[in-house]
């Protein structure tokens, strides 16, 4: 992927997020500093640590959206966690190190995807060979084994050879079968058998286990360890050729890639390019009246501190250093302020960005301008019913005005208010859409006032409905 400059990053963010220029600029600089650091000598690289960001602003103004879009802009491991999900060491719940384990897991998935793309041509070739064999099977003959051979195979399975199990049923290929396979291979190349069903054997997906999930929260990957030791159970599935091919390509790709290399690269990717977004960090600030719950909140801050400062976390893929991981924390800080965080943690987030509350003009832009704006989403949904939905400019202005007024009169939930209002406004259209014969519906200012006017006038209804 080509390296994007701070201006290019901001330009992409502008396609999805309205306003908040200061936050976009700070995030873009922090990301590009990653690239600058990698151009320096190794000794200097070790000295330069990321300048972590703390974003403060009301709910619904774009904090989470900025973080979410970062994952699509840079090919870097990215995880979003909520600070309220963590508990102090000694309490039941997720420990703070799990955010680093999640980051490495995401890096492994990204690296695996890259490696699978590299070997896909060869994996596709092998998958097609297997499809030919399944569509034109030969006569099977049982391979006789003595007890010693059976014992060796069993030990091989238990010691990790289960992924390379050999099929004890060998095939006898006659001239007739050979000709059939040539014919099938030719038809496969011409996509003539895509809808034909074929039965394949695939590894059974591991079942969810509440105990292993709890172990994972405690930092113990017991479920994965047991899955690696025990033989993989195979199940038969009957699928169309086009779907079976994709399943077989995945299985063949796993055989062709080197997972030790994937894990090593994933760890390096996490350490040098990883981004962890910690949301709701204001919710772990202790209040003025301290009780056991408040003490636990401050304990979570102290547990997060060494992770942000730089430490080594053990994962099932190997030890991971957090020295150069970029941390972005965010919170509404409605009942507290960033200076209420423990001083040590404040110092680890040197860049402070305040996001502004949204205005009526911002709401108008949010409705229309972003690449996948709310209005474009509803227009696309109704297009599936053959209906052309049109919003007049006056209607858009009225929707924005109502959203702004409701936010001012009740709880301010920012841009999220628009989704609630649009859902109520278009309720009848969405309900009757499939049965309508008209090809075009225009939403006017009068229609908006008719649908929402009574609710806006009644403050009690506004609180419950909008």
UniProtKB/Swiss-Prot annotation:
It holds the Pfam family AAA. It comes from the Bacteria. Its main location: cytoplasm. Coiled coil: none annotated. GO terms for molecular function: ATP binding; ATP hydrolysis activity; peptidase activity; proteasome-activating activity. GO terms for biological process: protein unfolding; proteolysis involved in protein catabolic process. InterPro entries: AAA+_ATPase, ATP-dep_Clp_protease_ClpX, ATPase_AAA_core, Clp_ATPase_C, HslU, P-loop_NTPase. GO terms for cellular component: HslUV protease complex. Keywords: ATP-binding, Chaperone, Cytoplasm, Nucleotide-binding. ATP binds at residues 18, 60-65, 279, 344, 416. It is found in: Cytoplasm. A double ring-shaped homohexamer of HslV is capped on each side by a ring-shaped HslU homohexamer. The assembly of the HslU/HslV complex is dependent on binding of ATP. ATPase subunit of a proteasome-like degradation complex; this subunit has chaperone activity. The binding of ATP and its subsequent hydrolysis by HslU are essential for unfolding of protein substrates subsequently hydrolyzed by HslV. HslU recognizes the N-terminal part of its protein substrates and unfolds these before they are guided to HslV for hydrolysis. Belongs to the ClpX chaperone family. HslU subfamily. PANTHER family: ATP-DEPENDENT CLP PROTEASE ATP-BINDING SUBUNIT CLPX-LIKE, MITOCHONDRIAL-RELATED, ATP-DEPENDENT PROTEASE ATPASE SUBUNIT HSLU. This is ATP-dependent protease ATPase subunit HslU. The gene is hslU.
């Amino acid at each position: 992927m080509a390296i994007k400059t701070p201006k290019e990053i901001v330009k992409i963010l502008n396609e999805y997020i309205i306003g908040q220029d200061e936050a976009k600029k700070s995030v873009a600089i922090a990301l590009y500093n990653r690239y600058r650091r990698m151009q320096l000598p190794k000794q200097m690289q070790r000295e330069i640590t990321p300048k972590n960001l703390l974003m403060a602003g009301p709910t619904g103004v774009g904090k989470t959206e900025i973080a979410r879009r970062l994952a699509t802009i840079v090919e870097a491991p990215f995880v979003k966690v909520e600070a309220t999900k963590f508990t102090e060491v000694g309490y039941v719940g997720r420990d703070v190190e799990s955010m680093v384990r999640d980051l490495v897991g995401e890096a492994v998935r990204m690296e695996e995807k890259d490696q699978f793309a590299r070997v896909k041509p060869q994996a596709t070739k092998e998958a097609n060979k297997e499809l030919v064999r399944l569509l034109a099977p030969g006569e099977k003959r049982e391979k006789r084994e003595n007890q010693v051979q059976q014992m060796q195979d069993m030990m091989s399975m238990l010691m990790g050879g289960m992924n390379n199990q050999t099929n004890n049923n060998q095939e006898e290929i006659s001239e007739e079968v050979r000709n059939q396979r040539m014919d099938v291979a030719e038809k496969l190349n011409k996509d003539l058998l895509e809808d034909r069903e074929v039965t394949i054997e695939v590894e059974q997906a591991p079942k969810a286990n509440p105990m292993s999930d709890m172990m994972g929260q405690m930092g113990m990957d017991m479920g994965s360890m047991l899955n690696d030791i025990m033989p993989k159970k195979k199940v038969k599935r009957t699928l169309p050729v086009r779907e079976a091919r994709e399943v077989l390509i995945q299985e063949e790709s796993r055989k062709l890639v080197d997972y030790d290399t994937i894990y090593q690269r994933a760890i390096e990717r996490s350490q040098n390019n990883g981004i962890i977004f910690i949301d709701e960090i204001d919710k772990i600030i202790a209040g003025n009246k301290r009780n056991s719950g408040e003490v636990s909140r401050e304990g979570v801050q102290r547990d997060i501190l060494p992770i942000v400062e730089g430490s080594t976390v053990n994962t099932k893929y190997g030890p991971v250093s957090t020295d150069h991981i970029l941390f972005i924390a965010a919170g509404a800080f409605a009942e507290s302020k960033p200076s209420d965080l423990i001083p040590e943690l404040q110092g680890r987030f040197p860049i402070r960005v305040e996001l502004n509350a949204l205005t009526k003009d911002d709401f108008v832009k949010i409705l229309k301008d972003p690449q996948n704006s709310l209005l474009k989403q509803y227009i696309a949904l109704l297009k599936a019913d053959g209906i052309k939905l049109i919003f007049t400019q006056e209607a858009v202005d009225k929707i924005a005005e109502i959203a702004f007024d409701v936010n001012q009169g009740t709880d301010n939930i920012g841009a999220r208010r628009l989704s609630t209002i649009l859902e109520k406004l278009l309720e009848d259209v969405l309900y009757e859409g499939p049965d309508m014969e008209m090809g075009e519906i225009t939403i006017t200012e009068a229609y908006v006032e008719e649908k929402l006017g009574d609710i806006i006038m009644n403050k009690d209804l506004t609180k419950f409905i909008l």
